């Protein structure tokens, strides 16, 4: 199979943040365009020696670490599966706009720093949460089981063009610099 990859894509959401005065931005870690499908991968790193708990439909996940005193400290983190599913839907919509046909899109959460034994997640069927060592095998599995006439890779140029067109990162940096400049001018004027 052939693959193309886009890393660190930033896309504007439909959620307006009134405090910031702009639409919220989603950060897609990796978009992998394979022969048969598009894979939207969210990478999450956890400290070693913790246990991860949660489910697909929970708002948050938790990881617990044991201290030397045999106490357990819980830390709340965003549900990476839920977040990545919404990213995947958006990327699939863009892909459909780019090539005027449905493209299979698969959301995968890639967990770094933990083993399977440390992950205690109740994940819905069709959702993928894998450790780093299993990520490539998971993508190979889908590439061998999905039959979509190589629709994804065949149109990779159109898909990449669309994903890059919709990216807002290049537009955000000048806005941030503009806001910083205005703030510095304001501080100077208020001295």
Annotate each predicted stretch with a short phrase.
Residues 1-26, 33, 37-38, 44-55, ...:
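Surface-exposed interaction regions that form or flank ligand-binding interfaces
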